Amino acid sequence: MACCVARCCSVPTGPATTICSSDKSCRCGVCLPSTCPHTIWQLEPTCCDNCPPPCHIPQPCVPTCFLLNSCHPTPDLLTVNLTTYVQPGCEEPCVPRCC
C-alpha cells in the first residue's frame, strides 16, 4: 500500500488536562496530537477521510461515500463545514483545496 493513501487525522495523546494551542494535521499517515483548546477528547481519536476536524465542531468519522454518493443514507451533516485536503505526494503535507 502506498504511503500517500493514508488519511489526515488528529489524535489526542494525553488526558483532558493537557494545555493545547491549535489543531495540527498529519503528513503521510503520521498523526500528530490534537491540540485544539475548544474541545476536550479523552484519548479518543477524531478523524475524517481527508481533513482535520474543525476545532469548534466535534464530529464523528464520516466515510467519503456518504458525502459523494446520494444512494447512501446521509448522516447529520447540517453543521459540517466540508473542506477537502489533497496529498500530492508522500513528502508533501495535506494542502487545502476548494471544493
Swiss-Prot record:
Keyword Acetylation carried by entry: yes
Region (3 X 5 AA repeats of C-C-X(3)) residue spans: 3-59
Sequence repeat segments: 3-7, 8-12, 47-51
Record keyword Plastid present: no
Pfam families per the UniProt record, alphabetical: Keratin_matx
Positions where N-acetylalanine occurs in the chain: 2
One cellular-component annotation, GO: cytosol
Gene Ontology molecular function, alphabetical: structural molecule activity
Keywords linked to the UniProt accession: Acetylation, Keratin, Repeat
Function: In the hair cortex, hair keratin intermediate filaments are embedded in an interfilamentous matrix, consisting of hair keratin-associated proteins (KRTAP), which are essential for the formation of a rigid and resistant hair shaft through their extensive disulfide bond cross-linking with abundant cysteine residues of hair keratins. The matrix proteins include the high-sulfur and high-glycine-tyrosine keratins.
Similarity comment: family membership: Belongs to the KRTAP type 3 family.
Record note on quaternary structure: Interacts with hair keratins.
Official protein name in the record: Keratin-associated protein 3-2
Source organism per UniProt: Mus musculus
Gene: Krtap3-2
